[in-house]
Amino acid sequence: MVTDIKQQHPDCKIDWLVEEAYAPLIKMHPAVHRVIPVAIRRWRRDFGQQGIWEEISQFSRSLRQNTYDIVLDSQGLIKSAVLSKISRGRTVGFAPGSSREWLAGISYAVKIQVSREMHMIDRCRKLAEKALGYRTNKERDYGLSTLTSKASASNTAMIFCGSAQRRKLWSVVHWIKVIRHVQQHGLEVEFTWGSQNDLDICQKIQAEAGGKILPKMELNELVSQLGETRLVIGVDTGLMHLAASLEVPLIAIFGASDPLKTGPLGHGPIQVCGSSTSFPDPEEVTRSATELLELG
């Protein structure tokens, strides 16, 4: 979406408001003028602690220092709609019925209908097209093309087994079988994690299957690591989409969300296992791993 906007309006300046953990990644996009970190998750976690309200007030004042021609909310959530309202500018977002949360949809000055049957990435692109009055048939461009994977020269498989949503987690027993299969193909396995729960899962799998648990990294550091990875296997998280954008060979495991609407999209080799209603068995994932490894 950001790449599209910059191509259509090369003189525009794009500021991106993003959860603070993702700020290092957004800074890597060449079309972004300024990254504005927000700490909604941390504020929720530490709500009531000393200094939080002052931090929120300072953030709100800072956000209102600039006036924008358009404030475009591509999330369609109540929290993102509130942040849009705090900003100075004409708010544009998904209309009720199109937005992920109905109350968000009624809050924007300009409400745009976009089919909920489209993939989420394409929905965001279409929202920007309608908001800014252009049409594009160009392929998706994540703005990370200069970081194309060196996967073929690597013997590392990276595992994304954690998720903030428990419903998206895959069985530890299944993970162990898949990791042993990958190791039999001569790959070294590395685990990444973002929370203590993620780390606990990694440690359970590692205790049975081995592998290396990487230290906690910023997203920009993880991008560098991913660019030299032969294979990624992961559940439905933002990290899975990051791997797809970097064209790393990817196996995406689904079971509680719809891959037709939120699945990985990229120009590299991708195998999707599972569906919106059922997780794959480990044999399906090992077959996919064999296919991708034989490609290169």
Segments from the language model and where they lie:
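Catalytic machinery of carbohydrate-active enzymes
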Residues: 1-296
